[in-house]
From Swiss-Prot:
Keywords recorded for this protein, A-Z: Acetylation, Cell projection, Cytoplasm, Hydrolase, Nucleus, Phosphoprotein, Protease, Repeat, Thiol protease, Ubl conjugation pathway
InterPro entries found in the cross-reference section: DUSP-like_sf (IPR035927), Papain-like_cys_pep_sf (IPR038765), Pept_C19_DUSP (IPR006615), Peptidase_C19 (IPR050164), Peptidase_C19_UCH (IPR001394), Ubiquitin-like_dom (IPR000626), Ubiquitin-like_domsf (IPR029071), Ubl_USP48 (IPR044743)
Active-site residues per Swiss-Prot or TrEMBL entry: C98, H353
Comp. bias (Polar residues): 616-627, 924-940
Protein name: Ubiquitin carboxyl-terminal hydrolase 48
PANTHER family: UBIQUITIN CARBOXYL-TERMINAL HYDROLASE, UBIQUITIN CARBOXYL-TERMINAL HYDROLASE 48
Length: 1052
């Protein structure tokens, strides 16, 4: 099919030869493209918008073939949420609770612990016996033991693929959005559980934590002098093994039990010798628990950075661990089998993900527990190889080779071993009846949900099949051919064929013209379909209005024909007018604006389009929608403000403008052609005189300009020094022969000088408004010390407050000589006279001077103004401050911030060989200054820092300085984050100071720290001394670690 523009031209080509009154039905059907050939499927690739008979590519392709039933719904198979046979149940990750989930799975697969918890008395039994379970109430565990009971029962017999542990997490008071130290959680929870179970009467329940996890070791100290041995016996629930510098688990255990020498200042006080003696100390394992927890200390405190870091070194461990060599008492079996490996994915101590590899004690098969997902390992061997490749480490340490029965990991942080004798002696743990009843109820809810989801899927499939049959039937009957037809919106047809959206009633209102018929311009978004198909659509979906053959609008077609013919005539007239303008004009002509002549064709086209639009709006509707008359008036008003044809030569009085450069004469013939398109345009024959009022105003303007020049010259001659800003008085160097000075507003001076420089462009200044310098009581608002400057034009209306910060930013007064004041009173009207008189006090020291003002100072108003300005400096938003980064400039930091100590490891040679500022830091590559200038900047910056106090309204940036937008209520920590983005310096590497004061309270606001707009803050960055893998977690690093403070683990 031809392109859309070609179809548009073809539909209206007949209008070139047919007059509006001769338009027939055939012309109307041609304009509406009734008889265009329909497109064929497979030939036409996409829908032809210019052809109402093209029904290809409207979304039918998805319905005309075989359709998979699953495409009729968006509901997942509920059986995907069902627990797989012979598998375990997962736990939902509530945000950052993966570390909790891993320990819950490890403890669940400890059958002895599970059995003991099932034996605990519970309020659940009362709930099942009463009306709780039958009354439809949800069971809410009351204690930690009850939460574990219910969780373990669900993990054992639930039909769900995963369960929600939010009740257990909420009972502990854990923050689900904050990742915590998994090893600390394990210790605290075991302590809490032991304390809770210690109150039980059943010894199997009361002592289960000690029996399963508790061992004993002794700190043994031997005096080298007398050989006396002292023991301190302690219980342990896990062994914390240092992995730094080791490659095998056995090496870590050996170091844990290694003998330590106590010598020198660390000597041991021997009670037998009654003095300090050299001694040895070591740990002896006295007894080992059934379940041996080995904590690998992967997360350690880094003294250099002041934060935790993760050790990503590989540690080798075996599936079988013989602890007999490490135990003092050799009786019994001490061979352990590996039962769980807890993994931390990630290179940082502040982020990552926790998973667990746990062995089923009954089948001996290994499973990977990853929150909701449970994966069974192939065979009966532990597989960590894939796990170790998930997180690439920055260190390129190669993974060591592992022998049979051994494994290596750089992410394992806890190993759980079970005593081999107990590992093989397992019986099935039964869920108590009262807990099983709760599990059955939860399973019943799950089954009901599965049935409900399956029914919803079935309903969606049935609806989809019915829609499929409807589309296959109706699409074949859509083409109208020579049969009776109707028009339907293309958008509605596409939505009817779109399975993802419900079909709404047909709405053709957007396609109507002002005559409530089908608009010819809207044919591109309509489709012509058979009357048979239209009847079915309207009977099933409703809507309207129905657009039959009677909806073809003859009035719109006739009007469009008229406009098209006028446009064709306009092209011919445009060429004729251009030719007439080039030829020599004979006889009288007409004045036409040059701007109108350049754009008359465009104006005529716009006028024709406006007429076409007004025809559409004639019945109060636009495209079927009600037309707002108020909006129409506003649009017309805006259009009227634009100049119409030949209005560019009208003067303000509606007559011919006196500016001859903006118009030209055209011939009578050219004007006649132009007047056909603009009959209401202003007409000015060549003999018409220009506007008489404008001529008078022009003469008066010339006279006023001459008068202004004369006044300006007179005032300049009378006040030459004031105009040129020379020989100005100042209070600090008061002339001996002058007793009084006067004050005027600096605003008056600016306006007066502007007039004197350009009297033709500015109005004369006739008065001086000094009242603006006074308070409402008529008193002065500034003190005399603030006027004692090097130059009176730099005077500020307020003095500095204590601390050196200026309290005013604008200079608004000037001092006047008495002789100048006499002349000013003659030339201008002065509303308020402000006079300062000097009086010398004392006969011995005449240099002591007092100043008396008329009017006098108003202390109350001045104090109020000072307080207001102080408040404004402390309460600002989106103000600009400047941060200056100091690099290799130790002297500057010492001078401006003595509290900052430079690293003591720097030698004198390093100081001498320090490169210029710009050679090491990219933030300094902002200036092309010479090396000589860089060398002098060290001394100059101290002076610059002092000059910051005398800040002007315009700050001049220097090298290594960046502007930041801040607010007074913003904390220092938030400012450090901004500085980090601007300078790529981590907050913990930033040393900030302002006027020699160190900024170190991260929680304080900038307002309380004395940071005001236009302040300059010095930034000294610490040199990087380690690989900051935790740079991505800098926001979390900067926050103080609170651990499990405020949770149930610490008895909140």
């Amino acid at each position: 099919m031809a392109p859309r523009l070609q179809l548009e031209k073809a539909a209206w080509r007949w209008a070139e030869t047919v007059r509006p009154e001769e338009v027939s039905q055939e012309h109307i059907e041609t304009a509406y493209r009734i008889w265009l050939e329909p497109c064929i499927r497979g030939v036409c690739r996409r829908n032809c918008r210019g052809n109402p008979n093209c029904l290809v590519g409207i979304g039918e392709h998805i319905w005309l073939g075989e359709i998979d039933e699953n495409s009729f719904h968006s509901i997942d198979d509920p059986n995907c949420e069902r627990r797989k046979k012979n598998s375990f149940v997962g736990l939902t990750n509530l945000g950052a609770t993966c570390y909790v989930n891993t320990f819950l799975q490890v403890w669940f697969l400890n059958l002895e612990l599970r059995q003991a918890l099932y034996l605990c008395p519970s309020t659940c039994s009362d709930y099942t016996k009463g009306d709780g379970i039958h009354g439809g109430k949800d069971y809410e565990p009351q204690t930690i033991c009850e939460h574990l009971q219910y969780l373990f029962a669900l993990l054992q017999n639930s039909n769900r693929r995963y369960i929600d542990p939010s009740g257990f997490v909420k009972a502990l008071g854990l923050d689900t959005g904050q990742q915590q130290d998994a090893q600390e959680f394990s210790k605290l929870f075991m302590s809490l559980l032991e304390d809770t179970l210690s109150k039980q009467k059943n010894p199997d329940v009361r002592n289960v934590v000690q029996q399963q996890f508790c061992g004993e070791y002794a700190y043994v100290t031997v005096c080298n002098q007398c050989g006396r041995e002292s023991k301190l016996v302690s219980k342990f629930y896990e062994l914390e093994l240092n992995i730094q510098g080791h490659k095998q688990l056995t090496d870590c255990i050996s170091e844990f039990l290694k003998e330590e020498r106590l010598e020198g200042d660390n000597r041991y006080f021997c009670e037998n010798c009654q003095s300090k003696q050299n001694a040895t100390r070591k740990i002896r394992l006295l007894s080992l628990p059934c379940t041996l927890n080995l904590q690998l200390m992967r997360f350690v405190f880094d003294r250099q950075t002041g934060h935790k870091k993760k050790l990503n070194a590989y540690i080798g461990f075996s599936e079988s661990l013989d602890m007999e060599p490490y135990v003092e008492h050799k009786g019994g079996s001490f061979v352990y089998e590996l039962s769980a490996v807890l993994i931390h994915r990630g290179v940082s101590a502040y982020s990552g993900h926790y998973i667990a590899h746990v062995k089923d004690p009954q089948s001996g098969e290994w499973y990977k527990f990853n929150d909701e997902d449970i994966e069974k390992m192939e065979g009966k061997k532990l597989q960590l190889g894939i796990e170790e490749d998930l997180e690439p480490s920055k260190s390129q340490t190669r993974k060591p080779k592992c022998g049979k029965g051994t494994h290596c990991s750089r992410n394992a942080y806890m190993l759980v071993y079970r005593l081999q004798a107990q590992e093989k002696n397992h019986t099935m743990v039964q869920v108590p009846a009262f807990l099983q009843e709760l599990v059955d109820r939860d399973n019943s809810k799950f089954e009901e949900w599965c049935v409900e989801m399956a029914e919803m899927r079935k309903q969606s499939v049935d609806k989809g099949k019915a829609k499929h049959e409807e589309v296959k039937e109706l699409y074949q009957r859509l083409p109208a051919g020579a049969e009776p037809y109707e028009f339907v919106s293309l958008e509605w047809l596409q939505k009817w064929l779109d399975e993802s959206t419900p079909t709404k009633p047909i709405d053709n209102n957007a396609c109507l013209c002002s005559h409530d018929k089908l608009h010819p311009d809207k044919i591109s978004i309509m489709k012509r379909i058979s009357e048979y198909a239209a009847n079915i659509f309207y009977s099933r979906y409703g809507g309207g209005p129905r657009l039959t053959v009677k909806a073809l609008c003859k009035d719109c077609v006739v009007e469009r024909c008229r406009v098209l013919r006028l446009k064709n005539q306009l092209n011919e007239d445009y060429k004729a007018v251009n030719n007439l303008l080039k030829s020599t004009m004979k006889g009288d002509g007409f004045w036409v604006g040059k701007s109108s002549l350049r754009s008359w064709r465009q104006l005529a086209l716009e006028q024709l389009d406006e007429q076409d639009g007004e025809a559409e709006q004639s019945n109060g509707k636009i495209n079927g929608s009600t037309f707002n008359k108020d909006e129409s008036k506003e649009e017309k008003k805006e259009e009227e403000e634009e100049l119409n044809f030949n209005e560019d030569i009208l003067c303000p009085h509606g007559e011919l403008s006196i500016s001859e450069n903006e118009r030209r004469l055209v011939s009578q013939e050219a004007w006649s052609k132009l007047q056909q398109y603009f009959p209401k345009a202003p007409e000015f024959p060549s003999y018409r005189e220009c506007c008489s009022q404008c001529k008078i105003l022009e003469r008066e303007g010339e006279e006023n300009e001459a008068l202004h020049k004369m006044i300006a010259n007179e005032q300049k001659t009378s006040l030459p020094n004031l105009f040129q800003d020379k020989n100005r008085p100042c209070l600090s160097n008061w002339p001996e022969d002058t007793d009084a000075l006067y004050i005027v507003s600096h605003f008056f001076l600016d306006e007066w000088r502007k007039f004197v420089r350009k009297p033709a462009r500015s109005a004369p200044v006739s008065s001086i408004g000094n009242a603006a310098l006074l308070c409402p009581h008529g008193g002065l608002m500034f003190t005399f010390p603030s006027l004692t400057k090097e130059d009176s034009k730099l005077c500020q209306p307020l003095e500095r407050r204590e601390g050196g910060w200026p309290t005013a930013a604008h200079n608004n007064i000037a001092l006047i000589w008495p002789s100048e004041w006499q002349m000013i009173q003659k030339l201008f009207v002065v509303d308020k006279v402000i006079k300062i008189t000097r009086i010398e006090v004392g006969d011995v020291n005449p240099s002591q001077t007092q100043y008396i003002s008329e009017p006098s100072l108003c202390p109350d108003c001045r104090e109020g103004l000072l307080c207001q300005q102080q408040r404004d400096l402390r309460e600002y938003t989106q103000a600009t401050i400047y941060v200056h980064k100091v690099v290799d400039n130790k002297k500057v930091m010492k001078d401006s911030a003595p509290e900052l100590n430079v690293s003591s490891s720097e030698t004198e040679e390093d100081k001498e060989e320090a490169k210029p500022d710009g050679e090491k830091d990219p933030d300094f590559n902002q200036s092309n200054g010479s090396t000589k200038r860089q060398k002098t900047s060290q001394q100059g910056y101290v002076a610059y820092q002092k000059q910051v106090i005398r800040r002007s309204t315009r700050h001049r940036k220097v090298r290594g300085e960046k502007a930041l937008l801040v607010s007074a209520n913003q904390t220092l920590k938030e400012l450090k984050i901004q500085i980090m983005h601007a300078f790529s310096v981590a907050p913990f590497d930033q040393n900030l100071s302002i006027d020699g004061k160190i900024l170190n309270d991260d929680c304080a606001t900038l307002g309380t720290l004395g940071v005001i707009p236009e302040s300059v803050i010095l930034l000294k960055a610490d040199e990087p001394i380690a690989d900051y893998a935790a740079m991505d977690d800098v926001m979390q690093v900067c926050m103080p670690e609170e651990g499990f403070k405020g949770t149930g683990l610490l008895g909140h």
